Amino acid sequence: MTSQLRKINNVIEQFLLPLAEAVSGWSTLAAIRSALIVTLPLMFLGSLAELLISFPLDAYKEFMFRQFGPEWRMFGQILKDATFSVMSLIMVFSIGHHLADQFNHDNPVLRANPVIAGLVAFTAFFCLLQQDGDALNRRWLGVAGLFVAILVGVFATRLFLYFFSIKRLHLHLPGGTPDIAIPQAFNAFIPGMLTVLVFAALGAAMQTFVGMSLHEALYQSIRMPFDAIGEGLGRGMLYILSLHVLWFAGIHGANVLDPITHDIYGAAMLANEVAAAAGEPLPHIMTKTFMDTFVFMGG
């Protein structure tokens, strides 16, 4: 037994640890990881809000109703809407900011304003959202849009920094200015415009030629292997494997795969509830409740 454990440790030290170090040292993944970490205070606040409005105890709900009236959930819902419901927006800005910080560390002479980089990525993300009449589809502003937010945050910021590194695209002001933000803004003027124009063209092309937003297209592509496998152990194993591969790369797998969780396992849970209410056999084994109880034990 000891020799087997020693062999396993040798394999981990020789192959897995160098791979993990290489992955953790990749600048893009490091920026994504840091961007997630700095959002933890807001995510913790959103978690408290979710607990406040969804605590599964009737005595608690009755107490809150007596103390604060029928609108007692409003406070928690406002907090949730300001955190979880806009997580993709927070994330895309945070990624842009951290990638610009890395760029400035590697290019101390040619410095880009991290806030401007974050705002450019933020705007690029909006260019890809599908419009519902005069309103935007809010589904992709929250956790469901996190995967696209990560992609847009990386590619939009990388594109902006590429344009920014071309000094001919900088607008130089004559003389000195008392506020350093002014030359930084003018230097980023053309690179920022070009980046947003590229993503606006991509958003328009997706709507015109594909008939759906990039969010929908990527989600359908991610869902295809899950649908192809069919319901059962294979789909569950693929879901868990995908989730932990994302975690291995430093990305919050549960949040990225939230659309799969909601549309497949959440729908299966609702179908079981309908069948149970009708006195029929439950049609699904693997549901969101099954995953939370038997796979993700401990919450």
Describe the residue ranges of each PLM region.
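Signature of multi-pass transmembrane helix bundles
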Residues: 2-43, 49, 65-68, 72-252
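Active-site beta-loop-alpha substructure in enzyme catalytic cores
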Residues: 50-54
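Carboxylate/His-rich catalytic cores and anion/metal-binding grooves
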Residues: 257-258
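Helix-loop-helix junctions within the multi-pass membrane cores of secondary transporters/permeases
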Residues: 261, 265-299
